[in-house]
Amino acid sequence: MQFKQWITHLGVGLLAATFAISSQAAIWSSTEVHLSNGDLLNPFAKKNEDTTILTFQHASGSKYVDNFFFFDQAYVKNKGITSYMEAYSSFSLGAITGKEISYGVIKDVGLIAGINMATDINKMWLLPGFRLRFDLPNFAFSNLDITSYNHVTTSSEDEKNEEESSYMVDFNWALPFEAGGLSWSLEGHAEFLAGRDMKHGDAKYENSILAQPQLRMDLGKALGYEANNLYVGLEYQYWKNKLGQKGQNESTVQLLSVWNF
């Protein structure tokens, strides 16, 4: 077995073990199903396509570890389905060492390990790095993640499209608020992914910026049912140099519904 394949299997195994162990001692957890629809840019065909995305998302936390996972199934009209997933585990250095690690609005520092997989094209990336946890007024959470971005080849065919390593910076947050007698939440993430060259040939991926803020309204609560179960709203997606393709910029609004359980 090649060294990189061994590292890949080890990384996936450690993430799976972390999820399994921490889920047994979870202090909190949230599981959601998202359904969204909009005209999304295909940066390779250079045109917008009617796309419906079904997302399964889970987050949980214990004293030492926070986990986050999502799996997307995207249906492109008249073309079929593609799949994509991301998973991250973040380890609190303050909790692990038993010492407060804070400064100003930074309330903790953690180590983070992530894996991204585009299953339909059989590509995988590993993202080790660190996390800054912020204590911002009224925010449910706010984090800044800084990781390396490492393409891992999973087959001899994949080696032909092997990428150089780069890095990613991601700010993720949730801000609940009340307005007009209704309960809302503004949440999402914004990331910068540094460009990278292909190891074979002259092709390259450009620097890209992706922002996906969601504005959600608690529809269940508004209708007199239990709060924090059913949301409706909008997701705005801005993507500069989408998927690393130079000049392929996206700015679109998607309809969004969320079931939380």
Predicted regions and their residues:
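Outer-membrane beta-barrel transmembrane domain signature
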Residues: 151-229, 259-261
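Short loop/turn motifs that connect adjacent beta-strands in outer-membrane beta-barrel proteins
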Residues: 25-29, 64-68, 93-110, 135-144, ...
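Membrane-embedded beta-strands of outer-membrane beta-barrel proteins
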Residues: 56, 87, 128-132, 169-173, ...
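Short glycine/proline- and aromatic-enriched beta-strand/turn motifs that initiate or cap beta-hairpins
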Residues: 25-74
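N-terminal signal peptide c-region/cleavage motif recognized by signal peptidases
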Residues: 20-23
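Outer-membrane beta-barrel "beta-signal"
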Residues: 249-261
